[in-house]
């Protein structure tokens, strides 16, 4: 909510930003705001377009029972992806009284993408002598429309101490995706040796809806005690139609495949929570409990629906001690839940190419994590230092399963899907520090080290035992009063996963910004991945087959942006955001 001096209006404000990058990337946006009396209006519009090359390999090596090479499949990928979209947001705040504010937030997104790739295959025998050569042509076109609206009201008796709020939010997402695949035989020299065959059209029509209703109440019980409580209802509905046609001979005779199917998924979560906070001298204490009752069901065409009901309790607690204004020690415990995402539940195959396919699992259960954390921080004249060791125990952990010997309709593929494993334990520490030397240098550094042990349980052979680490650096210097130089770097060491190993990842960004007309205008140049180090590589398989997959996603680019602002943009009440879900599937 906007906080203004009495009888002060911000009036009209606006802004414009635009930018482009090499190669073939462009974005532009504008915003307009108005505040007068009880009314606050703010709207934005943006358009972005991105065209980049994607190159990589998928090389497969098969072994005989004795462990000797049996055959090779080498795949080189040359692709290009084009993404573009329009974004619009509109926000209205209306002060009904000095203590009551009615707010509405609307967001619209229209997007489309075209993803094309040529994958060249070379088949070799055990001695790497030539056997066959062919090309798979893949073309994917996708369209999407997102509607999101939130209506809320807030009654404030004492800011941040005694408040009552309620919100209703609805999200609707429609996606249409069509993929065309062809196989073209080639001679050893790469020339065509015949007409294209094995044509395939995969069409997916998806509708996702989510309705959220919640109310939150905060009030002081005493001068040092505060109670927070609330209720939340969430409904999620997924509907997907998957239609597959095949032309095996390339003669125009398209036949519907048995892969065609329909999928419906419904989920409802009823939740309530209470948090009690108490201050005692230099200690701040907090204890909370959230209860959830959930039910869900999914249906596939021709199969009986499978319902699933569960209830959960999520206790939490925090003890914080401040021996001085410059130091703090905090101990915390919380129980968390991660529900499977939309793509993780989608059971229809999504082909990256003829050899690699992603398949979701609608039978996934949510995973639960008990997190214990200790945080110690110290702030001084020239910066701060924070050490945060942690331990996390997760049950029904959702992990990726890479199967290099899978088949889809008789075709040998490498499939990527998900399944629940029995448990996972991880422990490690985060070390973060900042250095402040005035305008000439402000720096930040972070280091993370952790070990994760995953046990698939008696029903699964999947397991992992890995140690990895990462660090990030950020430095900013004011070259002149109007020129700022900023650089950041990230590195993550290699890490083992179930049935595979991810190689290291590193990335650099450098930005030079120049202010014009005070703070009203600026121009910037950003170099993304200037050293071309952003590279993805994973090795996966078993004793019978090993696959190496590597990609460069065209991250490297030079961006030039211009920004202009007029007036003072009003502050608006944004919709409440859910806690971000942990992403434990891929490192």
Regions found by a protein language model. Give the residues of each.
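Membrane-proximal, glycine/serine-rich, low-complexity loop/turn segments characteristic
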Residues: 1-118, 140-173, 216-232, 277, ...
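C-terminal beta-barrel architecture of Gram-negative outer-membrane proteins
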Residues: 454, 466-516, 539-540, 544
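Extracytoplasmic loops and strand-loop junctions of Gram-negative outer membrane beta-barrel proteins
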Residues: 12-15, 69-76, 129-137, 148, ...
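Face-selective signature of the C-terminal outer-membrane beta-barrel domain
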Residues: 87-111, 136-300, 386-387, 425-448
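Outer-membrane beta-barrel translocator domains and adjoining extracellular loop/strand segments
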Residues: 54-70, 115-125, 130-132, 176-185, ...
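Outer membrane beta-barrel strand-and-loop segments of large Gram-negative receptors
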Residues: 76, 201, 210-214, 254-261, ...
């Amino acid at each position: 909510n906007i906080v203004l001096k009495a009888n002060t209006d911000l009036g009209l404000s606006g802004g414009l930003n635009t930018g482009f990058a090499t190669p073939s990337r462009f974005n532009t946006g504008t915003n307009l705001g108005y505040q007068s009396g009880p009314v606050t209006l703010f709207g934005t519009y943006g358009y972005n377009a991105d065209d980049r090359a994607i190159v990589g390999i998928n090389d497969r090596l098969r072994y005989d029972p004795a462990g000797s090479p049996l055959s090779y499949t080498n795949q080189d990928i040359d692709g290009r992806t084009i993404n573009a979209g329009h974004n619009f947001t509109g926000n209205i705040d209306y002060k009904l009284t000095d203590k009551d504010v009615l707010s509405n937030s609307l967001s619209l997104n229209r997007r489309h993408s075209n993803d094309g790739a040529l994958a060249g295959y070379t088949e070799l025998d055990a001695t790497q002598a030539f056997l066959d050569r062919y090309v798979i042509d893949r073309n994917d076109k996708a369209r999407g429309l997102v509607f999101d609206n939130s209506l809320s009201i807030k009654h404030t008796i004492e800011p941040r101490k005694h408040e009552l709020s309620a919100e209703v939010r609805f999200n609707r997402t429609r996606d249409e995706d069509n993929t065309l695949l062809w196989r073209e035989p080639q001679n050893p020299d790469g020339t065509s040796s015949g007409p294209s065959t094995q044509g395939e059209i995969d069409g997916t029509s998806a509708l996702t809806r989510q309705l959220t209703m919640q109310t939150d109440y905060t009030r002081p019980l005493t001068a040092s005690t505060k109670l927070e409580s609330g209720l939340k209802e969430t409904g999620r509905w997924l509907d997907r139609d998957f239609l597959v046609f095949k032309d095996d001979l390339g003669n125009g005779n398209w036949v519907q495949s048995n892969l065609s199917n329909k999928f419906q998924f419904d989920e409802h979560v009823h939740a309530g929570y209470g948090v009690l906070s108490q201050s005692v001298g230099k200690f701040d204490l907090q204890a909370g409990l959230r209860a959830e009752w959930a039910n869900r069901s999914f249906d596939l065409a021709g199969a009986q629906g499978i319902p699933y009901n569960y209830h959960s309790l999520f206790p939490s607690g925090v003890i914080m001690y401040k021996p001085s204004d410059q130091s703090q020690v905090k101990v915390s415990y919380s129980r968390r839940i991660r529900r499977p995402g939309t793509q993780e539940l989608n059971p229809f195959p999504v082909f990256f190419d003829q050899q690699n396919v992603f398949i979701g699992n609608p039978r996934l259960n949510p995973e639960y994590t008990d997190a214990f954390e200790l945080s110690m921080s110290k702030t001084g004249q020239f910066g701060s230092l924070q050490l945060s060791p942690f331990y996390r125990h997760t049950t029904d952990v959702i992990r990726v399963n890479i199967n290099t010997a899978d088949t889809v309709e008789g075709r040998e593929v490498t499939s990527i899907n998900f399944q629940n494993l029995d448990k996972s334990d991880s422990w490690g520490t985060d070390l973060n520090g900042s250095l402040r030397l005035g305008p000439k240098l402000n720096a930040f550094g972070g280091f993370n080290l952790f070990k994760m042990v995953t046990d698939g349980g008696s029903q699964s052979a999947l397991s992992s035992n890995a140690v990895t680490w990462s660090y990030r650096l950020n430095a900013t210097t004011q070259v002149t009063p109007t020129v700022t130089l900023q650089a950041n770097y990230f590195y993550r060491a290699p890490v083992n996963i179930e049935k595979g190993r991810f190689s290291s990842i590193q990335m650099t960004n450098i930005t030079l910004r120049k202010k014009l007309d005070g703070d009203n205008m600026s121009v910037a140049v950003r170099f993304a991945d200037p050293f071309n180090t952003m590279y993805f590589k994973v090795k996966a398989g078993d004793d019978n087959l090993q696959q190496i997959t590597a990609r460069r996603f065209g991250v490297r680019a030079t961006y030039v942006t211009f920004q202009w602002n007029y007036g003072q943009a009003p502050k608006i009440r944004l919709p409440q955001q859910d806690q971000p879900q942990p992403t434990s599937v891929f490192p």
